[in-house]
Amino acid sequence: SDLIRETMDKKFKDITEWLIKGSIDFNFICESLLPSLCEEGSNPLKVGRMEYDAIVVPDCETLRSSTLERLEQFRNQGGKLIFMGNAPVYENAVTSDRGRKLYEKSVCISFDRARLLSALEDNRTVTLRYADGKLTDDFIYQLRKDNDCEWLFISHCCEPYNKDVFRSKNLRIILG
């Protein structure tokens, strides 16, 4: 229905915004392409040229067998597997308890910004904090490797309350 679709769209938008504004590096992994990009689960999970120490499964009702297989292997080898919201109840769109069993062995959090950022705290590459220690929520960054150099670009991502008044903010930038 339209209401279900709207809810799913909102959750997708929310998790994307929480990760970006929470200074967490991430990529979306396409479940249909996963078998061709990741032959088996490992820790870190190797998908194409990328490697992942943490995987977030955001409130999925169904997962493919091939995805569950790789996630189980990743988790069994010590990878950080985080489920947000409810456990998957379907495997290949058929009722199954395989997703629930994996869910129960993993980090389980509610669909909430603070819990997500807290669960991923140890996986940060760059941390942006205000002088008072709070995480920023109005900056984004990009860290690039270019030959033997690394470049860090930080930018505001929100419109200021009043464009005519400049408000400076002291930031603490932590790499690694």
What are the roles of these predicted feature ranges?
Residues S1-G176:
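Carbohydrate-binding surfaces of carbohydrate-active enzymes
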